[in-house]
């Protein structure tokens, strides 16, 4: 009996091997908006069928996108997200396990033992469409030829090349996103034009962005082709506030001295009009220097007057702010002071 059983097992293994030894020869996406989106179908032994979404994840979709010469993964649809396949189509693959670096789905670990999967569990894939006008996504952004990294001519990195941006596709909401992405303050001059000295050279990025102004970076905005024959005379120039930085100078430690704040790439002083203990507290807190000492700021002038710009005046804090940038003050650069009125702050040197 044992020899007969072994013979039957051998015949069965040959039959199974003849049916499933070959990996899928072709992959396609069906039912989506373009060739790089849809239900995943594979060809196996001349028959097209679907893939079960058991364990289907972003790594598997990445391989499908790569095999089809599509762009990056956008989504990993599961559960029959697209139109149902033809009634005669079978579910050919129960499970797919890719590490995400394979060039084709055939190089992944595939399970052909379909036992509990229906077309309601068909796997899908959504990749960037390289044939679409919408594939203008900037990889990075920078502001150049300005006084600091928060002011200048807008340039975006696209397909490994820096390009200027036409102001026809620019607005306040886009500027807000750029300022946030660069780690700068709020948007000031939002979409001015470059002058002859600050115009760029080389390619002009012909994309138009639609942002709400709340996005973390430009990649989260909607993009389309800009139908405009722009020249470098229309290069976009914008300015953000600098990151709110402050320091105490002239003292024996970083926790005592004349107060200076950074604006437009330059350090300047703060006028002591209306300055008091609450404002001292906020500065010490922001610098990690503990609590403020000497509650009569008007009486201490021991670190000498500053030079250059006086950036802030009439600063008013509640004392609860974590940074001086959240306190009320006059517009940057507006004041009625001299450097004899520069603010000085002395803190305890450590958090308590």
Swiss-Prot record:
It is found in: Secreted; Cytoplasm. One of its GO terms (cellular component) is plasma membrane. N-glycosylated. N-glycan at Asn-99 possesses only alpha2,6-sialylated terminals, while Asn-229 possesses both alpha2,6-sialylated and non-sialylated terminals. N-glycosylation increases secretion. The record marks 316 as: Not glycosylated. Pfam families: SRCR. SUPFAM superfamilies: SRCR-like. Specifically expressed in tissue macrophages. Expressed in thymus, liver, spleen and lymph nodes. Present in Th17 cells; mainly present in non-pathogenic Th17 cells. Coiled coil: none annotated. Residues 27-128, 141-241, 246-348 form the SRCR domain. Residues 1-21 form the signal peptide. Keywords: Apoptosis, Cytoplasm, Disulfide bond, Glycoprotein, Immunity, Inflammatory response, Repeat, Secreted, Signal. Glycans are attached at residues 99, 229. Disruption phenotype: Mice are apparently healthy under specific pathogen-free conditions. However, thymus of mice display much fewer thymocytes and CD4/CD8 double-positive (DP) thymocytes are more susceptible to apoptosis. Increased adipocyte size and adipose tissue mass. Higher level of free cholesterol in Th17 cells. Induction: Transcription is activated by nuclear receptor liver X /retinoid X (RXR/LXR). Disulfide bonds join 36-70, 52-117, 65-127, 98-108, 166-230, 179-240, 211-221, 255-289, 271-337, 284-347, 317-327. SMART domains: SR. InterPro entries: SRCR (IPR001190), SRCR-like_dom_sf (IPR036772). GO terms for biological process: apoptotic process; immune system process; inflammatory response; positive regulation of complement-dependent cytotoxicity; regulation of complement activation. Interacts with FASN; the interaction is direct. Interacts (via SRCR2 and SRCR3) with pentameric IgM (via Fc region); disulfide-linked. Secreted protein that acts as a key regulator of lipid synthesis: mainly expressed by macrophages in lymphoid and inflamed tissues and regulates mechanisms in inflammatory responses, such as infection or atherosclerosis. Able to inhibit lipid droplet size in adipocytes. Following incorporation into mature adipocytes via CD36-mediated endocytosis, associates with cytosolic FASN, inhibiting fatty acid synthase activity and leading to lipolysis, the degradation of triacylglycerols into glycerol and free fatty acids (FFA). This is CD5 antigen-like. It comes from Mus musculus (Mouse). The gene is Cd5l.
């Amino acid at each position: 009996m044992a020899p007969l059983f072994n013979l039957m097992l051998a015949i069965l293994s040959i039959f199974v091997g003849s049916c499933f030894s070959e990996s899928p020869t072709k992959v396609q996406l069906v039912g989506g908006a373009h060739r790089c989106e849809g239900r995943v179908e594979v060809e196996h032994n001349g028959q097209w069928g679907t893939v079960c979404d058991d364990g289907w994840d972003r790594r598997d979709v990445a391989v499908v996108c790569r095999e089809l010469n599509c762009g990056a993964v956008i989504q990993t649809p599961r559960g029959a997200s697209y139109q149902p396949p033809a009634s005669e189509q079978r579910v050919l693959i129960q499970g797919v396990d890719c590490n995400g670096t394979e060039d084709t789905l055939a190089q992944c670990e595939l399970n052909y033992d379909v036992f509990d999967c229906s077309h309601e569990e068909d796997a899908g894939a959504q990749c960037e469409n390289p044939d679409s006008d919408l594939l203008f996504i900037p990889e990075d952004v920078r502001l150049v030829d300005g006084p600091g990294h928060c002011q200048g001519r807008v340039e975006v990195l696209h397909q490994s090349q820096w390009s200027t941006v036409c102001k026809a596709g620019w607005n306040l909401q886009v500027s807000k996103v750029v300022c946030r992405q660069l780690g700068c303050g709020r948007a000031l001059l939002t979409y001015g034009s470059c002058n002859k000295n600050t115009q760029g050279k080389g390619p002009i990025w012909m994309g138009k962005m639609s942002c709400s102004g709340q996005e973390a970076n430009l990649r989260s905005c909607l993009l389309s082709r800009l139908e405009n024959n722009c020249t470098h005379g229309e290069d976009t120039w914008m300015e953000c506030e600098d990151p709110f930085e402050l320091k105490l100078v002239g003292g024996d430690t970083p926790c005592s001295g004349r107060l200076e704040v950074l604006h437009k790439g330059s350090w300047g002083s703060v006028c002591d009009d209306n300055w008091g203990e609450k404002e001292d507290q906020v500065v010490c807190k922001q610098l990690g220097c503990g609590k403020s000492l000497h509650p009569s700021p008007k009486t201490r002038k021991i670190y000498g007057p500053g030079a250059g710009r006086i950036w802030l005046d009439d600063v008013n804090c509640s004392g609860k702010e974590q940074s001086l940038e959240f306190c009320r003050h006059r517009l940057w650069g507006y004041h009625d002071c001299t450097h004899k009125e520069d603010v000085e702050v002395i803190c305890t040197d450590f958090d308590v």
